[in-house]
């Protein structure tokens, strides 16, 4: 499990987890590629109190340090990411490559005080069972540490209902 405290509102931590547009720029070579910055269109469905949406995009590279994903090539197979946003601050993310191999992420952000939160991320997968858990844990540590500056710099600190009042910094 990855646990990270942030000097931000929980809404900003969730916003960051669901923003695939920052992957090529903040996580190049790990979650995205600056040569493929476009985010595919996705439709959001509301079922009860849960928001559902999914995207299909070219896969990111596996690296020697982090052989995390089930793909063997960079672009094919494509990765399907299926998100469920459970309000107020919980996400279930399922990753698949069109076969039986898959990953699941459970992420929740706990408000600690005004503009302070704690994020918890649990990851599971049904492949590479011989690989030490520390590989995924270190990968998530790198990703969360790369996101820290982005999450903590957003103004206003809480995601507003009127997004035109947002100043987004990178």
Residue ranges and their predicted role:
Residues 4-170:
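C-terminal catalytic domain of Rieske-type non-heme iron oxygenases
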